[in-house]
Amino acid sequence: MSDIQSRTDGFSSKLMEILDHVEYRRVETGEDMEEVARIRYKAYKMADILTLKGTTLIDDVDFDPQAYVFGVYYDERLISTVRMHHVTPDHRVSLTRDTFPKEIDAFLDAGLSLIDPVRFAADIDVMREMPAIPYLTLRIAIMAAAYFDADRVLQLVSPQHAAFYRRVFYAQTIVPPGKLWKVQYRPDADGDQHP
C-alpha cells in the first residue's frame, strides 16, 4: 500500500471515528444562538475578519425564512456552526450576493437555485485538537444541496483556503482572485460549467 493511500485511509478512519460522536442540529433557540455567537466571536476575533459588535455576530439574516443555522456538536458540546441560505430566483437573500451581486444574479436570472453557506465558525480550542472540523461542518452544505435539489453550492473563500475547496469540493473560481474571491462547486462534481 502506498504512503499516500495509507494516509488517506488513516484520515478517513479517523473521520469516521469522530462522526460516531457528532450530532448535527438546527439552531433555533435563543440559548443555542448565544452559543453560536460565542463561537463566532472567538473564531472571528482570532481570524480578524469581522467587526466584533453584537449586531455582526447574530443578525436579522440568521432568522430569515430561508436561512438555516446549524450547529455541529461533539459529545453534546457545540464545536462549530454554519449558516445555510437557500437562495432562489424569488428569494435572493444571501451574504455572498451582497458581496458579488452581478455574479450571483447571473445564476439566479438563469433560474438556478443556490446553497450559500456562510458564517462558518469553529471553536478554536477544539480546532487545534480536531482539524477535521471544516470537513464535518461543510458537509452540511452538500446535504442542503441534495435536500433542496440546488444547482450550485457557493463559498466565499480566502486565497489561503482555495486549494482545500478545489481538492475537497471540486471548486471552480467564478470571481477572479482579488481582494475577495469566490468559488462554487456542483453537488454532483461532474465538472460541467454553466453560468
Regions from the PLM with identified roles:
Residues 58-63, 160-163:
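Beta-rich nucleic-acid/ligand-interaction surfaces
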Residues 1-9:
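Acidic, low-complexity proline/glycine-rich segments
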Residues 61-71, 91-93:
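A short helix-loop-beta-strand connector motif used in the catalytic cores of GNAT acetyltransferases and
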Residues 91, 95-191:
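Acyl-donor binding region in acyl/amide transferases
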Residues 86-88:
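A short acidic/small-residue loop/turn micro-motif
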Residues 81:
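Short glycine-/small-residue motifs
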Residues 10-59, 69-73, 78:
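Short amphipathic alpha-helix that is part of the acyltransferase structural core
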